[in-house]
């Protein structure tokens, strides 16, 4: 009995505990579900927020991408513009100013005026120049204004005008004796994009000018060849890598240009060829009715003057001292017939006869002898026959030697020796008399420069100089209106002193 009661009590206790536990588990599950639902809501909220942020970020990325693309496009535009500006800046263009000038004073050993000039000897009338150092008292100025541009298509343009003046007076006010004139005014068109083949890279020109390929011997103030006038032509027609040609037509006037009735003009057609260092130039000219030309008073100027002529030049332009050592050198042989017998200034002498013949040889070079000594020899010789009168003869030769001794980077001693022999048989033309003989000149010139002492072609220079010259007595009798033999300037030795500036840029 006791055992049955105990079992009943145990069953009752177990049943109540299970019910209590069941109620407790249900409440716990509900709570857990509620918490889980809340967490899901929180997760959905966070996911929604994240999606919003992602959408916003994506929008910002798209905006940044667009901005970057715009920036890149702008950068590319700026780069292209910068490149264009740089290319434009690198193109040669704009205005340029160039010039040449010399001016000085000279006196004899009595502190009086004296004769001077590179063409002061009787041979000077036919181009026989002598050394110019310590032998010039004039003021001569050339001023060149140029405008250049390069177009987008690569074509180039160039305009140049040169104004020049020469004076022999020492006064500061010289308008009444001025020789001021416009010596050049021309236009060039280069690298035209429609030009092909041999004409690609060539240059067209027209106007009044000195030919681009003229060259001279500076120390004796003489052109080897000087082609100038008004006309037109083309430079640098390239047949191959080493052969190029220039073609031109120049016009010149003879006689008094102030005479409105003077219609005689000399037309010069020229072909100038270059094959490496070798130059071959051929020119033909015609001046219709030159033998009927009259002066301002209606008088016949020269009834036997030539109407036509030819001219030729063979030149060699070395980038060394005659192939022997460092330096430079140029050599030329010239021939002219008829109107071409004035071989230096092509087509400039209207008094030449149809049978006139002239040969000319010219050569000069520069080279250093040591670190402080530099030398520049030159030779110029000419033979002309039947020039103005049947049977006349003009023969002369000039040897010139200039030395520079560097003392400091700004001071040098310049030395020059010049010798000329002449045999002139004018046959009475223009009241000239037959003479032969020699002329000598020695010059010593302390010289100041800003640098490049050994460069014969660097300027400016300021020189102080003394010169001695003498000549054969027979040369005093050549003419009554030339320098040699004039009053106070006769053979027997002449001293001169002076100073001079010279510059070009």
Curated annotation (Swiss-Prot):
Family according to the record: Belongs to the porin LamB (TC 1.B.3) family.
Molecular-function annotations in GO: carbohydrate transmembrane transporter activity; porin activity
Ranges in coiled-coil conformation: none
Low complexity biased stretches: 46-82
Protein's name according to its UniProt entry: Sucrose porin
Signal peptide span: 1-22
Highest taxon, organism lineage: Bacteria
Major subcellular site: membrane
GO biological process: monoatomic ion transport; polysaccharide transport
Quaternary state and interactors: Homotrimer.
Location of the region described as Disordered in the Swiss-Prot/TrEMBL record: 44-94
Domain notes: The C-terminus helps to anchor the porin to the outer membrane.
Biased composition (Basic and acidic residues): 83-93
PANTHER family: CRYPTIC OUTER MEMBRANE PORIN BGLH-RELATED
Location within or outside the cell: Cell outer membrane
Keyword field: Cell outer membrane, Ion transport, Membrane, Porin, Signal, Sugar transport, Transmembrane, Transmembrane beta strand, Transport
Membrane-topology descriptor: Multi-pass membrane protein
Gene Ontology CC: cell outer membrane; pore complex
Function description: Porin for sucrose uptake.
């Amino acid at each position: 009995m006791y055992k049955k009661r105990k079992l009943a009590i145990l069953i009752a206790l177990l049943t109540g505990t299970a019910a209590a536990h069941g109620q407790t588990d249900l409440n716990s599950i509900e709570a857990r579900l509620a918490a889980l639902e809340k967490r899901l809501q929180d997760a959905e909220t966070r996911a929604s927020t994240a999606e919003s942020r992602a959408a916003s970020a994506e929008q910002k990325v798209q905006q940044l991408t667009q901005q970057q693309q715009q920036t890149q496009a702008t950068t590319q535009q700026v780069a292209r513009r910068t490149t264009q500006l740089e290319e434009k800046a690198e193109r040669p263009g704009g205005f340029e100013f160039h010039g040449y000038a010399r001016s000085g004073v000279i006196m004899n050993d009595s502190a009086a005026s004296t004769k001077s000039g590179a063409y002061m000897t009787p041979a000077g009338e036919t181009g026989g120049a002598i050394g110019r150092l310590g032998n010039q008292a004039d003021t001569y100025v050339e001023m060149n204004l140029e405008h250049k541009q390069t177009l987008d298509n690569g074509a180039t343009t160039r305009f140049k005008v040169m104004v020049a003046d020469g004076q022999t007076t020492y006064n500061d006010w010289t308008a009444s004796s001025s020789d001021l004139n416009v010596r050049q005014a021309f236009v060039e068109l280069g690298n035209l994009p429609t030009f092909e083949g041999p004409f690609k890279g060539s240059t067209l020109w027209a106007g009044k000018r000195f030919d681009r390929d003229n060259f001279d011997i500076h120390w004796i103030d003489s052109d080897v060849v000087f082609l100038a006038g008004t006309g037109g032509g083309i430079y640098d027609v390239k047949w191959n890598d080493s052969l190029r040609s220039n073609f031109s037509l120049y016009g010149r006037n003879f006689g008094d240009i102030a005479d409105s009735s003077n219609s005689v003009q000399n037309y010069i057609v020229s072909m100038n060829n270059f094959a490496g260092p070798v130059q071959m130039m051929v020119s033909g000219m015609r001046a219709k009715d030159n033998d009927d030309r009259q002066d301002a008073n209606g008088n016949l100027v020269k009834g036997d003057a030539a109407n036509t002529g030819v001219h030729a030049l063979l030149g060699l332009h070395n980038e060394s001292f005659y192939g022997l050592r460092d330096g430079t050198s140029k050599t030329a042989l010239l021939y002219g017939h008829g109107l071409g017998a004035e071989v230096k200034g092509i087509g400039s002498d209207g008094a030449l006869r149809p049978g006139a013949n002239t040969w000319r040889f010219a050569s000069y070079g520069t080279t250093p002898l040591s670190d402080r000594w530099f030398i520049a020899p030159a030779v110029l010789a000419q033979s002309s026959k039947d020039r103005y009168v049947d049977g006349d003869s003009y023969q002369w030769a000039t040897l010139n030697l200039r030395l520079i001794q560097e003392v400091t980077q700004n001071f040098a001693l310049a030395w020059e020796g010049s010798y000329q022999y002449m045999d002139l048989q004018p046959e009475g033309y223009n009241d000239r008399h037959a003479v032969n003989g020699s002329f000598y000149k020695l010059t010593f010139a302390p010289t100041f420069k800003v640098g490049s002492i050994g460069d014969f072609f660097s300027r400016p220079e300021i020189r102080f100089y003394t010169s001695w010259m003498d000549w054969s007595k027979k040369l005093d009798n050549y003419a009554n209106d030339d320098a040699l033999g004039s009053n106070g300037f006769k053979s027997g030795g002449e001293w001169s002193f002076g100073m001079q500036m010279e510059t070009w840029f």
